[in-house]
Amino acid sequence: MQIYNTLTRRKETFTPLDAGRVRMYVCGITVYDYCHIGHARVMVAFDMITRYLRWRGFEVDYVRNITDIDDKILKRAEENDEPIAALTERMIAAMHEDEGRLGVLRPDREPRATAHVDDIVAMVQRLIDKGYAYPAANGDVYYRVRRFEGYGKLSNRDLDDMRAGSRVEVETAKEDPLDFVLWKAAKPGEASWPSPWGDGRPGWHIECSAMSTCCLGDTFDIHGGGPDLVFPHHENEIAQSEAATGRPYVNTWMHAGAVRVDQEKMSKSLGNFFTIREVLEAHAPEVVRYLLLASHYRSPINYAPDALSDARRSLERFYNALQGVAPVAGEVAAGYRERFIAAMDDDFNTAEALAVLFDLARELNRAKQEAPAHAPALAHELKELGGVLGLFGQDPEGFLQAGAGRLPMSEEDIEARIEARAQAKKAKDFATADGIRDELAALGIVLKDGRDGTTWVVEGD
Protein backbone atom coordinates (compact mmCIF):
# COMPACT_ATOMS: atom_id res chain seq x y z
CA MET A 1 0.00 0.00 0.00
CA GLN A 2 1.32 3.40 -1.04
CA ILE A 3 0.35 6.64 0.76
CA TYR A 4 1.40 10.16 -0.17
CA ASN A 5 3.30 11.70 2.74
CA THR A 6 3.11 15.50 2.95
CA LEU A 7 6.34 15.46 4.98
CA THR A 8 8.45 13.80 2.28
CA ARG A 9 6.32 15.04 -0.64
CA ARG A 10 6.14 11.59 -2.23
CA LYS A 11 4.23 8.32 -2.09
CA GLU A 12 5.72 5.79 0.32
CA THR A 13 5.05 2.17 1.18
CA PHE A 14 2.90 2.23 4.30
CA THR A 15 4.24 0.10 7.13
CA PRO A 16 2.54 0.64 10.50
CA LEU A 17 4.70 0.81 13.62
CA ASP A 18 2.84 -2.21 15.01
CA ALA A 19 2.05 -4.93 12.48
CA GLY A 20 -1.67 -5.05 11.73
CA ARG A 21 -2.51 -1.95 13.79
CA VAL A 22 -2.84 1.64 12.56
CA ARG A 23 -2.81 4.57 14.96
CA MET A 24 -4.33 7.65 13.31
CA TYR A 25 -5.06 11.15 14.59
CA VAL A 26 -7.07 13.72 12.62
CA CYS A 27 -7.60 17.34 13.61
CA GLY A 28 -11.27 17.92 14.30
CA ILE A 29 -13.25 21.13 14.41
CA THR A 30 -13.35 24.11 16.73
CA VAL A 31 -16.92 23.90 17.98
CA TYR A 32 -18.15 27.49 17.79
CA ASP A 33 -20.30 27.14 14.64
CA TYR A 34 -21.93 24.56 12.38
CA CYS A 35 -19.67 22.39 10.21
CA HIS A 36 -19.23 23.56 6.62
CA ILE A 37 -18.69 21.63 3.40
CA GLY A 38 -14.90 21.87 3.82
CA HIS A 39 -15.21 20.05 7.14
CA ALA A 40 -17.34 17.44 5.36
CA ARG A 41 -14.49 16.83 2.91
CA VAL A 42 -12.08 15.99 5.73
CA MET A 43 -14.67 13.92 7.62
CA VAL A 44 -15.58 11.82 4.59
CA ALA A 45 -11.97 11.43 3.39
CA PHE A 46 -10.68 10.00 6.66
CA ASP A 47 -13.85 7.97 7.15
CA MET A 48 -13.14 6.37 3.76
CA ILE A 49 -9.51 5.75 4.75
CA THR A 50 -10.54 4.19 8.06
CA ARG A 51 -13.17 1.97 6.41
CA TYR A 52 -10.72 0.76 3.77
CA LEU A 53 -7.90 0.03 6.23
CA ARG A 54 -10.30 -2.01 8.38
CA TRP A 55 -11.64 -3.86 5.33
CA ARG A 56 -8.05 -4.74 4.45
CA GLY A 57 -7.63 -6.31 7.88
CA PHE A 58 -5.98 -3.57 9.92
CA GLU A 59 -7.06 -2.72 13.43
CA VAL A 60 -7.47 1.07 13.32
CA ASP A 61 -7.37 3.30 16.39
CA TYR A 62 -8.91 6.47 14.96
CA VAL A 63 -8.68 9.55 17.18
CA ARG A 64 -10.19 12.90 16.15
CA ASN A 65 -10.05 15.75 18.62
CA ILE A 66 -12.56 18.43 19.51
CA THR A 67 -11.30 21.95 20.22
CA ASP A 68 -13.77 23.15 22.85
CA ILE A 69 -11.84 26.16 24.16
CA ASP A 70 -10.58 28.85 21.81
CA ASP A 71 -10.78 32.61 21.18
CA LYS A 72 -13.52 32.04 18.57
CA ILE A 73 -15.56 30.05 21.08
CA LEU A 74 -15.20 32.76 23.74
CA LYS A 75 -16.24 35.44 21.26
CA ARG A 76 -19.27 33.50 19.94
CA ALA A 77 -20.47 32.61 23.45
CA GLU A 78 -20.28 36.29 24.41
CA GLU A 79 -22.13 37.34 21.24
CA ASN A 80 -24.85 34.76 21.94
CA ASP A 81 -24.96 35.56 25.65
CA GLU A 82 -24.60 31.79 26.06
CA PRO A 83 -22.47 29.77 28.49
CA ILE A 84 -19.38 28.34 26.79
CA ALA A 85 -20.31 24.75 27.68
CA ALA A 86 -23.83 25.20 26.28
CA LEU A 87 -22.43 26.51 22.98
CA THR A 88 -19.84 23.77 22.59
CA GLU A 89 -22.24 20.95 23.53
CA ARG A 90 -24.78 22.27 21.03
CA MET A 91 -22.20 22.42 18.24
CA ILE A 92 -20.78 18.98 19.07
CA ALA A 93 -24.28 17.47 18.88
CA ALA A 94 -24.83 19.22 15.53
CA MET A 95 -21.50 17.92 14.21
CA HIS A 96 -22.41 14.35 15.14
CA GLU A 97 -25.80 14.74 13.48
CA ASP A 98 -24.27 16.18 10.29
CA GLU A 99 -21.58 13.53 9.93
CA GLY A 100 -24.04 10.76 10.74
CA ARG A 101 -26.26 11.86 7.85
CA LEU A 102 -23.21 11.74 5.56
CA GLY A 103 -22.53 8.15 6.61
CA VAL A 104 -19.40 9.07 8.55
CA LEU A 105 -18.61 6.57 11.30
CA ARG A 106 -17.72 8.05 14.68
CA PRO A 107 -13.99 7.98 15.55
CA ASP A 108 -12.92 5.54 18.23
CA ARG A 109 -12.02 8.44 20.51
CA GLU A 110 -12.87 12.14 20.48
CA PRO A 111 -10.69 13.82 23.12
CA ARG A 112 -11.70 17.32 24.14
CA ALA A 113 -9.12 19.99 24.90
CA THR A 114 -10.80 20.94 28.18
CA ALA A 115 -10.42 17.36 29.44
CA HIS A 116 -6.66 17.38 28.77
CA VAL A 117 -5.56 20.65 30.35
CA ASP A 118 -3.35 18.83 32.88
CA ASP A 119 -1.59 16.97 30.05
CA ILE A 120 -1.16 20.23 28.15
CA VAL A 121 0.32 22.00 31.19
CA ALA A 122 2.73 19.09 31.70
CA MET A 123 3.90 19.26 28.06
CA VAL A 124 4.41 23.03 28.26
CA GLN A 125 6.46 22.59 31.44
CA ARG A 126 8.59 19.94 29.72
CA LEU A 127 9.28 22.35 26.86
CA ILE A 128 10.28 25.08 29.33
CA ASP A 129 12.57 22.66 31.18
CA LYS A 130 14.27 21.73 27.90
CA GLY A 131 14.72 25.35 26.83
CA TYR A 132 12.21 25.23 23.98
CA ALA A 133 9.71 27.54 25.66
CA TYR A 134 9.69 30.52 28.00
CA PRO A 135 7.21 32.38 30.19
CA ALA A 136 6.89 36.00 29.06
CA ALA A 137 6.32 39.15 31.07
CA ASN A 138 2.68 39.33 29.94
CA GLY A 139 1.84 35.94 31.51
CA ASP A 140 1.84 34.00 28.22
CA VAL A 141 4.20 31.11 27.49
CA TYR A 142 5.84 31.03 24.04
CA TYR A 143 7.65 28.40 21.97
CA ARG A 144 11.17 29.27 20.77
CA VAL A 145 10.85 28.48 17.07
CA ARG A 146 14.55 28.95 16.24
CA ARG A 147 15.52 26.48 18.98
CA PHE A 148 13.94 23.62 16.99
CA GLU A 149 16.25 22.69 14.12
CA GLY A 150 13.65 20.98 11.96
CA TYR A 151 11.13 23.83 11.89
CA GLY A 152 9.65 24.22 8.42
CA LYS A 153 10.22 20.63 7.26
CA LEU A 154 6.52 19.83 6.80
CA SER A 155 5.52 23.02 4.98
CA ASN A 156 8.90 23.30 3.20
CA ARG A 157 9.45 26.81 4.53
CA ASP A 158 12.68 28.58 5.38
CA LEU A 159 12.92 30.35 8.74
CA ASP A 160 14.70 33.39 7.36
CA ASP A 161 12.07 33.79 4.64
CA MET A 162 9.34 33.55 7.27
CA ARG A 163 11.12 36.17 9.39
CA ALA A 164 11.52 38.52 6.42
CA GLY A 165 7.86 38.18 5.51
CA SER A 166 6.45 38.49 9.02
CA ARG A 167 4.67 41.65 10.05
CA VAL A 168 5.98 43.85 12.84
CA GLU A 169 4.62 42.51 16.10
CA VAL A 170 2.69 44.87 18.35
CA GLU A 171 3.19 42.40 21.19
CA THR A 172 6.74 42.86 22.48
CA ALA A 173 6.64 40.01 25.00
CA LYS A 174 8.06 37.57 22.44
CA GLU A 175 11.80 37.02 22.11
CA ASP A 176 11.29 36.57 18.37
CA PRO A 177 8.29 37.45 16.16
CA LEU A 178 8.24 33.83 14.89
CA ASP A 179 7.60 32.42 18.37
CA PHE A 180 4.06 31.17 18.98
CA VAL A 181 1.92 30.91 22.07
CA LEU A 182 1.61 27.72 24.13
CA TRP A 183 -0.31 29.14 27.07
CA LYS A 184 -2.42 32.30 27.10
CA ALA A 185 -2.82 34.33 30.27
CA ALA A 186 -6.49 34.85 31.06
CA LYS A 187 -8.09 38.27 30.89
CA PRO A 188 -10.51 39.20 33.69
CA GLY A 189 -13.71 37.18 33.43
CA GLU A 190 -12.40 34.72 30.82
CA ALA A 191 -12.55 30.94 31.17
CA SER A 192 -9.26 29.78 32.66
CA TRP A 193 -7.37 26.98 34.37
CA PRO A 194 -4.60 27.18 36.97
CA SER A 195 -0.99 26.68 35.87
CA PRO A 196 2.53 27.37 37.19
CA TRP A 197 2.49 30.57 35.10
CA GLY A 198 -0.86 31.84 36.32
CA ASP A 199 -4.45 31.26 35.29
CA GLY A 200 -4.95 30.88 31.56
CA ARG A 201 -5.86 28.53 28.76
CA PRO A 202 -3.97 26.44 26.19
CA GLY A 203 -2.87 27.65 22.79
CA TRP A 204 -4.46 25.78 19.89
CA HIS A 205 -1.32 24.04 18.63
CA ILE A 206 -0.28 22.52 21.96
CA GLU A 207 -3.75 21.03 22.45
CA CYS A 208 -3.27 18.63 19.54
CA SER A 209 0.30 17.71 20.50
CA ALA A 210 -0.82 16.77 24.00
CA MET A 211 -4.03 14.97 23.05
CA SER A 212 -2.51 12.97 20.19
CA THR A 213 0.48 11.72 22.18
CA CYS A 214 -1.71 10.98 25.22
CA CYS A 215 -4.01 8.84 23.08
CA LEU A 216 -1.59 7.25 20.61
CA GLY A 217 1.92 7.50 22.08
CA ASP A 218 4.96 9.67 21.32
CA THR A 219 5.16 8.34 17.74
CA PHE A 220 2.21 7.14 15.69
CA ASP A 221 1.38 6.18 12.11
CA ILE A 222 -0.87 8.79 10.47
CA HIS A 223 -1.79 12.38 11.21
CA GLY A 224 -4.41 13.99 8.99
CA GLY A 225 -6.36 17.16 8.47
CA GLY A 226 -7.44 19.82 6.03
CA PRO A 227 -5.09 21.58 3.61
CA ASP A 228 -5.08 24.82 5.60
CA LEU A 229 -3.54 23.08 8.63
CA VAL A 230 -0.14 22.23 7.12
CA PHE A 231 1.16 25.60 8.28
CA PRO A 232 1.25 26.77 10.95
CA HIS A 233 -0.79 24.22 12.92
CA HIS A 234 0.82 20.93 11.91
CA GLU A 235 4.27 22.49 11.58
CA ASN A 236 3.94 23.72 15.16
CA GLU A 237 2.67 20.34 16.36
CA ILE A 238 5.85 18.71 15.05
CA ALA A 239 8.05 21.32 16.74
CA GLN A 240 6.27 20.94 20.08
CA SER A 241 5.95 17.16 20.13
CA GLU A 242 9.44 16.26 18.90
CA ALA A 243 11.06 18.80 21.23
CA ALA A 244 9.06 17.47 24.19
CA THR A 245 9.60 13.74 23.55
CA GLY A 246 12.89 13.66 21.65
CA ARG A 247 11.28 11.24 19.18
CA PRO A 248 9.78 11.44 15.68
CA TYR A 249 6.17 12.57 16.04
CA VAL A 250 4.33 11.12 13.03
CA ASN A 251 5.42 8.77 10.24
CA THR A 252 2.86 9.75 7.58
CA TRP A 253 1.18 13.14 7.18
CA MET A 254 -2.01 13.21 5.08
CA HIS A 255 -4.00 16.25 3.97
CA ALA A 256 -7.34 16.37 2.16
CA GLY A 257 -7.83 18.78 -0.73
CA ALA A 258 -9.70 22.06 -0.52
CA VAL A 259 -13.33 22.61 -1.49
CA ARG A 260 -14.02 25.40 -3.96
CA VAL A 261 -17.47 26.77 -4.77
CA ASP A 262 -18.09 27.51 -8.44
CA GLN A 263 -14.28 27.53 -8.88
CA GLU A 264 -13.80 30.17 -6.17
CA LYS A 265 -12.39 29.79 -2.69
CA MET A 266 -15.19 29.26 -0.18
CA SER A 267 -15.50 32.19 2.20
CA LYS A 268 -18.22 34.04 4.09
CA SER A 269 -17.12 37.35 2.55
CA LEU A 270 -17.82 36.02 -0.96
CA GLY A 271 -21.24 34.76 0.08
CA ASN A 272 -20.44 31.21 -1.08
CA PHE A 273 -20.06 29.63 2.35
CA PHE A 274 -22.27 26.58 2.97
CA THR A 275 -22.80 24.60 6.16
CA ILE A 276 -23.34 20.85 5.88
CA ARG A 277 -26.92 21.21 7.06
CA GLU A 278 -27.65 23.87 4.44
CA VAL A 279 -26.30 21.54 1.76
CA LEU A 280 -28.32 18.58 3.06
CA GLU A 281 -31.53 20.60 2.98
CA ALA A 282 -31.21 20.64 -0.81
CA HIS A 283 -29.34 17.43 -1.63
CA ALA A 284 -29.54 13.79 -0.59
CA PRO A 285 -26.73 12.90 1.85
CA GLU A 286 -25.42 10.05 -0.30
CA VAL A 287 -25.20 12.40 -3.30
CA VAL A 288 -23.02 14.77 -1.28
CA ARG A 289 -20.87 11.90 0.00
CA TYR A 290 -20.45 10.60 -3.56
CA LEU A 291 -19.36 14.04 -4.76
CA LEU A 292 -16.74 14.18 -2.00
CA LEU A 293 -15.40 10.73 -2.98
CA ALA A 294 -15.53 11.14 -6.76
CA SER A 295 -12.20 12.98 -6.78
CA HIS A 296 -8.93 11.82 -5.22
CA TYR A 297 -8.86 12.90 -1.58
CA ARG A 298 -5.84 15.18 -2.18
CA SER A 299 -7.40 16.91 -5.19
CA PRO A 300 -9.45 20.08 -4.83
CA ILE A 301 -13.20 19.63 -5.28
CA ASN A 302 -15.48 22.10 -7.00
CA TYR A 303 -18.83 22.30 -5.24
CA ALA A 304 -21.30 23.42 -7.91
CA PRO A 305 -24.85 22.52 -9.04
CA ASP A 306 -23.70 20.61 -12.12
CA ALA A 307 -21.19 18.60 -10.04
CA LEU A 308 -23.98 17.57 -7.66
CA SER A 309 -26.22 16.65 -10.59
CA ASP A 310 -23.42 14.49 -12.00
CA ALA A 311 -23.04 12.79 -8.60
CA ARG A 312 -26.77 12.09 -8.42
CA ARG A 313 -26.84 10.66 -11.94
CA SER A 314 -23.84 8.44 -11.14
CA LEU A 315 -25.57 7.05 -8.07
CA GLU A 316 -28.73 6.46 -10.09
CA ARG A 317 -26.71 4.37 -12.55
CA PHE A 318 -25.41 2.21 -9.71
CA TYR A 319 -28.80 1.82 -8.07
CA ASN A 320 -30.43 1.05 -11.43
CA ALA A 321 -27.92 -1.77 -11.84
CA LEU A 322 -28.68 -3.10 -8.35
CA GLN A 323 -32.46 -2.78 -8.79
CA GLY A 324 -34.38 -6.04 -8.99
CA VAL A 325 -31.47 -8.29 -7.95
CA ALA A 326 -31.11 -9.97 -4.56
CA PRO A 327 -27.34 -9.95 -3.82
CA VAL A 328 -25.88 -13.36 -3.01
CA ALA A 329 -22.20 -14.05 -2.33
CA GLY A 330 -20.64 -16.01 -5.16
CA GLU A 331 -17.68 -16.21 -7.48
CA VAL A 332 -17.02 -13.22 -9.74
CA ALA A 333 -14.34 -14.01 -12.27
CA ALA A 334 -13.53 -10.67 -13.88
CA GLY A 335 -11.01 -9.39 -11.30
CA TYR A 336 -13.01 -6.39 -10.13
CA ARG A 337 -11.99 -6.89 -6.51
CA GLU A 338 -8.30 -7.02 -7.42
CA ARG A 339 -8.60 -3.85 -9.53
CA PHE A 340 -10.50 -2.10 -6.74
CA ILE A 341 -7.80 -3.01 -4.22
CA ALA A 342 -5.05 -1.90 -6.61
CA ALA A 343 -6.73 1.51 -6.96
CA MET A 344 -7.28 1.97 -3.25
CA ASP A 345 -3.79 0.71 -2.36
CA ASP A 346 -2.47 3.51 -4.59
CA ASP A 347 -2.97 6.33 -2.09
CA PHE A 348 -6.71 5.65 -1.70
CA ASN A 349 -7.55 6.53 -5.31
CA THR A 350 -11.33 6.62 -5.03
CA ALA A 351 -11.73 8.09 -8.52
CA GLU A 352 -10.10 5.00 -10.04
CA ALA A 353 -11.93 2.69 -7.62
CA LEU A 354 -15.28 4.16 -8.72
CA ALA A 355 -14.29 3.63 -12.37
CA VAL A 356 -13.83 -0.06 -11.51
CA LEU A 357 -17.28 -0.10 -9.90
CA PHE A 358 -18.81 1.44 -13.04
CA ASP A 359 -17.33 -1.44 -15.05
CA LEU A 360 -18.82 -3.86 -12.54
CA ALA A 361 -22.23 -2.15 -12.79
CA ARG A 362 -22.12 -2.45 -16.59
CA GLU A 363 -21.44 -6.17 -16.33
CA LEU A 364 -24.26 -6.52 -13.81
CA ASN A 365 -26.64 -4.83 -16.26
CA ARG A 366 -25.55 -7.21 -19.02
CA ALA A 367 -25.96 -10.22 -16.74
CA LYS A 368 -29.50 -9.16 -15.81
CA GLN A 369 -30.39 -9.40 -19.50
CA GLU A 370 -28.16 -12.21 -20.77
CA ALA A 371 -27.11 -14.39 -17.81
CA PRO A 372 -29.46 -13.81 -14.85
CA ALA A 373 -27.86 -16.60 -12.83
CA HIS A 374 -24.66 -14.54 -12.52
CA ALA A 375 -26.40 -11.31 -11.49
CA PRO A 376 -26.75 -12.00 -7.72
CA ALA A 377 -22.99 -12.55 -7.26
CA LEU A 378 -22.17 -9.44 -9.28
CA ALA A 379 -24.67 -7.40 -7.25
CA HIS A 380 -23.12 -8.71 -4.03
CA GLU A 381 -19.66 -7.71 -5.23
CA LEU A 382 -20.87 -4.23 -6.17
CA LYS A 383 -22.62 -3.75 -2.82
CA GLU A 384 -19.60 -4.93 -0.84
CA LEU A 385 -17.00 -2.86 -2.68
CA GLY A 386 -19.26 0.20 -2.69
CA GLY A 387 -19.85 -0.35 1.01
CA VAL A 388 -16.10 -0.02 1.62
CA LEU A 389 -16.55 3.59 0.45
CA GLY A 390 -19.73 4.01 2.49
CA LEU A 391 -21.93 3.91 -0.64
CA PHE A 392 -24.86 1.85 -2.01
CA GLY A 393 -26.29 1.11 1.42
CA GLN A 394 -29.85 2.10 0.54
CA ASP A 395 -32.61 0.03 -0.97
CA PRO A 396 -32.37 0.65 -4.75
CA GLU A 397 -36.13 1.06 -5.16
CA GLY A 398 -36.26 3.60 -2.36
CA PHE A 399 -33.33 5.64 -3.68
CA LEU A 400 -34.66 5.71 -7.23
CA GLN A 401 -38.24 6.50 -6.22
CA ALA A 402 -37.03 9.36 -4.01
CA GLY A 403 -35.41 10.91 -7.06
CA ALA A 404 -38.02 9.99 -9.63
CA GLY A 405 -40.26 12.96 -8.95
CA ARG A 406 -37.50 15.48 -9.53
CA LEU A 407 -37.59 15.36 -13.34
CA PRO A 408 -40.79 16.73 -14.89
CA MET A 409 -39.72 15.37 -18.31
CA SER A 410 -37.20 12.83 -19.58
CA GLU A 411 -33.54 13.75 -19.93
CA GLU A 412 -33.88 13.17 -23.69
CA ASP A 413 -36.70 15.73 -23.89
CA ILE A 414 -34.69 18.23 -21.85
CA GLU A 415 -31.69 17.82 -24.15
CA ALA A 416 -33.97 18.22 -27.19
CA ARG A 417 -35.34 21.50 -25.82
CA ILE A 418 -31.78 22.71 -25.14
CA GLU A 419 -30.80 21.86 -28.73
CA ALA A 420 -33.87 23.71 -30.05
CA ARG A 421 -32.86 26.73 -27.97
CA ALA A 422 -29.31 26.58 -29.35
CA GLN A 423 -30.65 26.54 -32.91
CA ALA A 424 -32.93 29.49 -32.13
CA LYS A 425 -30.01 31.48 -30.71
CA LYS A 426 -27.93 30.61 -33.78
CA ALA A 427 -30.74 32.00 -35.96
CA LYS A 428 -30.85 35.09 -33.71
CA ASP A 429 -34.41 34.17 -32.72
CA PHE A 430 -33.83 35.26 -29.14
CA ALA A 431 -37.52 35.42 -28.28
CA THR A 432 -37.88 31.68 -28.95
CA ALA A 433 -34.61 30.93 -27.13
CA ASP A 434 -35.73 32.90 -24.08
CA GLY A 435 -39.13 31.23 -24.23
CA ILE A 436 -37.56 27.75 -24.07
CA ARG A 437 -35.38 28.83 -21.17
CA ASP A 438 -38.39 30.24 -19.30
CA GLU A 439 -40.47 27.14 -20.09
CA LEU A 440 -37.81 24.88 -18.56
CA ALA A 441 -37.32 27.23 -15.61
CA ALA A 442 -41.04 26.99 -14.86
CA LEU A 443 -40.55 23.22 -14.57
CA GLY A 444 -37.65 23.70 -12.15
CA ILE A 445 -34.93 23.04 -14.74
CA VAL A 446 -32.22 25.71 -14.69
CA LEU A 447 -29.98 26.18 -17.73
CA LYS A 448 -26.34 27.22 -17.40
CA ASP A 449 -24.59 28.55 -20.50
CA GLY A 450 -20.84 28.01 -20.61
CA ARG A 451 -17.92 27.98 -22.99
CA ASP A 452 -18.47 24.28 -23.70
CA GLY A 453 -22.21 24.52 -24.24
CA THR A 454 -25.30 24.50 -22.06
CA THR A 455 -25.78 22.30 -19.00
CA TRP A 456 -28.84 21.94 -16.83
CA VAL A 457 -29.65 21.26 -13.20
CA VAL A 458 -32.84 20.66 -11.28
CA GLU A 459 -33.59 23.66 -9.09
CA GLY A 460 -32.88 22.85 -5.46
CA ASP A 461 -30.90 19.72 -6.39
Curated annotation (Swiss-Prot):
Protein localization: Cytoplasm
GO biological process terms held by the UniProt record: cysteinyl-tRNA aminoacylation
Gene Ontology MF annotations: ATP binding; cysteine-tRNA ligase activity; zinc ion binding
Motif window: 'KMSKS' region: 265-269
Reaction catalyzed: tRNA(Cys) + L-cysteine + ATP = L-cysteinyl-tRNA(Cys) + AMP + diphosphate
Cofactor note: Binds 1 zinc ion per subunit.
Cofactor: Zn(2+)
CC per GO annotation: cytosol
Enzyme nomenclature, EC number: 6.1.1.16
UniProt motif ('HIGH' region) ranges: 29-39
Source taxon at top rank: Bacteria
Alphabetical list of InterPro entries matching this protein: Cys-tRNA-ligase (IPR015803), Cys-tRNA-synt_Ia_DALR (IPR015273), Cys-tRNA/MSH_ligase (IPR024909), CysS_C (IPR056411), Rossmann-like_a/b/a_fold (IPR014729), tRNA-synt_1_cat_dom (IPR032678), tRNAsynth_Ia_anticodon-bd (IPR009080)
Family designation: Belongs to the class-I aminoacyl-tRNA synthetase family.
Oligomeric form and interacting partners: Monomer.
Designated name of the protein: Cysteine--tRNA ligase
